[in-house]
Curated annotation (Swiss-Prot):
Xref: CDD domains: GT5_Glycogen_synthase_DULL1-like
Gene Ontology cellular-component terms listed: cytosol
Record bears the keyword Transferase: yes
Protein name: Glycogen synthase
Region (Disordered): 497-533
Protein role: Synthesizes alpha-1,4-glucan chains using ADP-glucose.
GO MF annotation terms: alpha-1,4-glucan glucosyltransferase (ADP-glucose donor) activity; alpha-1,4-glucan glucosyltransferase (UDP-glucose donor) activity
Gene: glgA
Residues the entry annotates as binding ADP-alpha-D-glucose: K12
The organism of origin for this protein: Burkholderia thailandensis (strain ATCC 700388 / DSM 13276 / CCUG 48851 / CIP 106301 / E264)
SUPFAM superfamilies linked: UDP-Glycosyltransferase/glycogen phosphorylase
Length: 533
């Protein structure tokens, strides 16, 4: 059972929602019986398929009468349970904030309730005819589940806690602990107390049977003071129970050949439609119609974490150095940054387009229509936007940190296989380092269009699916529950074997043309490496 605060398309503020939708889908394809438990936001209740009430739980916490509404995810059919409590979840504003962008004052209560209900379901106390062998909780919103189930003995399911972002800790007043039903013996520095506060994230990291992060590099980084946000000692102490598993993406949803939100389809074998997507995006955003202009995009939260402040500071000089360059930004975040980018768009009409907010369909069109994705980060647990970009043949520029370091291979650091090139990488979180990477990328785009096209195909060829990572999670679950999960694990492995046989048969049918294309790409990749120096 997944416990999460959001899952696409029912509710989304960021990459967490994408993972909590696409990973269950991939696990189901391997034979795993997965359910997702999340809050019943108004938008989720509107979008879920075939909703029906399956449990009336009464007051799980004082003043919070709860029922569970079952349904399924659109498109994937993954079963979902929505925690229905209108006073807590059906509100104006976003999932975590009010209309004024301030966090809801009762967020500890809102997500404490989610964890309490998850614990009841996990222990068979919710009146449902299903119990999980493993509860997989995500980020601080699900951090209390392992604590709330710890005293159940053999009836307790195993718990996995995934840290998607160690900076978001879910810290609240320690007085909130009694209201959300936490045991008094856990309210110490050896439990959930963190510098005088209650920390949901620390609870998950302290009590879960296994911990994961969303990339191998980030798993190491959070054990250091630079990235651990005060909990690095706990992460280091649990290093033997900590795994870094790279996020994947839903390659059916993110597929330029079938994407219903694109004006023209295209594929690695026929890139012609990408030019049409670029022209349509320029028209949609009010940019100059210029097929040869390097169109740089950024789709992210506007925060210092994403180096949005550096992008805003350095973009004018980049526009001056590259007179044809265009820039498109889509996202929301810090109000001062939003206003700064809006002002920049007014200063550079027809060259800079800014769309504050988040529209999933526009995000698809930007990833398809842009030439370059600029995605700096002071820290980045995994990052999904660079995976979407590569899937769509848009070249990412990223900082060598976290999951960005694990997923993007820079042209100038290739050794020995040039066919692994997927983008441009810089090291320091500075304007100079980012600007130099952008210069290298734009120069290659402008000077060597044939080589650029080959690089785009190399990026598209990268496997960003959940295939390998979903199997890693399945192995983790099976290791936690060897006696309870032997039969189910065999079923899952049988499904995986069937998929492998089908893939092998498909590969045999395509082997000759694929090898020919790969050799051609290798030759072009070597030209790319030379051209970038």
């Amino acid at each position: 059972m997944f416990v999460a605060s959001e899952a696409f398309p029912l509710a989304k503020t960021g990459g967490l929602a994408d993972v909590c939708a696409s990973l269950p889908k991939a696990l189901r394809a391997l034979g795993c019986d997965v359910r997702v438990l999340m809050p019943g936001y108004a938008q989720a209740l509107d979008r879920v398929l075939r909703p029906r009430v399956v449990a009336e739980l009464g007051e799980v916490l004082p003043g919070a009468a709860v029922r569970i509404i079952a349904g399924s995810m659109p498109d994937s059919g993954v079963p979902v349970w929505l925690l229905d409590c209108p006073s807590l979840y059906r509100r104006a504003g976003s999932l975590y904030c009010g209309p004024d962008d301030a966090d809801w004052a009762d967020n500890a209560y809102r997500f404490g309730l989610l964890c309490q209900v998850a614990a009841r379901v996990a222990l068979g106390a919710a009146g449902l005819r299903w119990r999980p062998d493993v509860v997989h909780a995500h980020d601080w919103h699900g951090g209390l589940v392992a604590l709330l189930t710890r005293g159940a003995g053999d009836a307790r399911p195993k718990t996995v806690f995934t840290i998607h972002n160690a900076a978001f800790q879910g810290n609240f007043a320690l007085d909130d602990a009694a209201r959300i039903g936490l045991p008094a013996d856990a309210l110490s520095v050896d439990g959930v107390e963190f510098y005088g506060q209650l920390s949901f994230l620390k609870a998950g990291a302290r009590y879960a049977d296994r911990l994961t992060t969303v990339s191998p590099t980030y798993a190491g980084e959070i054990q250091t003071a630079e990235f651990g946000c005060g909990l690095e000692g706990l992460y280091a102490a649990r290093r033997d129970q900590l795994s870094g598993i790279m996020n994947g993406i839903d390659t059916e949803l993110w597929n330029p050949a079938t994407d219903r939100w694109l004006p023209q389809p295209y594929s690695i074998d026929d890139m012609g439609g990408k030019a049409g997507c670029k022209a349509a995006l320029q028209q949609e955003l009010g940019l100059c119609a210029d097929a040869r202009a390097p169109l740089v995009a950024s789709v992210c939260r506007l925060t210092s974490q994403k180096m949005s402040d550096i992008v805003l500071e350095r973009l004018p000089e980049q526009l001056a150095q590259h007179p044809r360059m265009q820039f498109a930004l889509h996202g929301r975040g810090d109000r001062a940054l939003e206003q700064g980018f809006d002002a920049l768009a007014a200063q550079y009409p027809r060259r800079v387009a800014v769309r504050i907010g988040y529209d999933e369909t526009l995000a698809h069109r930007i990833h398809a229509g842009a030439d370059i994705l600029l995605h700096g980060a002071r820290f980045e647990p995994c990052g999904l936007t660079q995976l979407y970009a590569m899937r769509y043949g848009t070249i990412p520029i990223v900082r060598r940190v976290g999951g960005l370091a694990d997923s993007v291979v820079d042209l100038d650091t290739l050794a020995p296989h040039s066919e692994d090139a997927t983008g441009f990488v810089f090291d320091a979180p500075t304007g100079d380092a980012m600007s130099e990477a952008l210069r290298r990328c734009v120069n290659l785009h402008d000077a060597r269009p044939g080589v650029w096209s080959a690089l785009c195909r190399l990026a598209m060829a990268r496997d960003s699916s959940w295939s390998r990572s979903a199997r890693a999670y399945l192995d983790l679950y099976a290791a936690l529950t060897p006696r309870r999960r032997v039969e189910a694990s065999d079923e899952a492995r049988g499904a995986a074997a069937a998929l492998a046989r089908a893939d092998a048969a498909s590969g045999r049918r395509r082997r000759a043309p694929e090898q020919s294309e790969r050799l051609r790409q290798e030759r072009l990749a070597r030209q790319v490496a030379l051209a970038s120096k």
